[in-house]
């Protein structure tokens, strides 16, 4: 069942960090942690990665018994993100039986010339997300511990409304914690998908 759909532009700066840096970061911001929760992403594409070739990401995310189908497409700055809220039954059918959810995202994928019957979950990634109040109402800071295909990595993300400004803010935050800032252009999806044999 389709519940609703929304579109927005996602602009974020990200940096992959070591486990020790992750622990240092959480210690530094321990009094500013606002929420911590688990989320699981199920990444969808065709066996021959037709969506990836177009620069498009597609996933189902489960957070606290809430399920969202998301399509991300590149823009000149940031990503166009289309979200479609789905129920658990629809999510399970997509993940377990490759039955793609009805709705605008399905229609968009079909317009790209992709047969939705070829789409299936190829990888999944579980994240322990810690959200931090960084004192800036224009940004959203989080620290993620990600587990996928036997790999664990750690990442800082800062969402904002202008890419260069957001990167500069994240560099400042990293510097404050003694973390070397190295821009991470690889999304969680590309990292998880790169482990597929």
Annotate each predicted stretch with a short phrase:
Residues 1-197:
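Phosphate-end processing signature that detects enzymes handling 5′-triphosphorylated RNA
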């Amino acid at each position: 069942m389709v519940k609703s759909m929304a579109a927005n532009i996602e602009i974020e700066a990200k940096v992959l960090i070591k486990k020790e840096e992750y622990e240092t970061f959480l210690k530094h911001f321990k009094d500013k942690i606002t929420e911590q929760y688990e989320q699981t992403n199920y990444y969808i594409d065709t066996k021959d990665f037709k969506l990836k070739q177009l620069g498009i990401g597609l996933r189902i995310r489960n957070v606290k018994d809430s399920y969202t189908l998301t399509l991300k497409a590149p823009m000149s700055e940031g990503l166009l993100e289309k979200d479609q809220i789905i129920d658990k039954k629809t999510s399970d059918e997509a993940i377990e039986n490759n039955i793609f959810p009805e709705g605008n995202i399905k229609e968009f994928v079909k317009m790209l010339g992709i047969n939705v019957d070829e789409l299936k979950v190829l990888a999944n990634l579980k994240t322990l997300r810690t959200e931090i109040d960084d004192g800036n109402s224009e940004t959203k800071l989080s620290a993620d511990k990600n587990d996928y295909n036997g790999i664990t990595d750690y990442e800082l993300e800062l969402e904002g409304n202008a890419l260069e400004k957001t990167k500069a803010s994240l560099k400042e935050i990293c510097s404050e914690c003694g973390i070397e800032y190295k821009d991470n252009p690889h999304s969680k999806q590309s990292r998880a998908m790169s482990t597929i044999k």
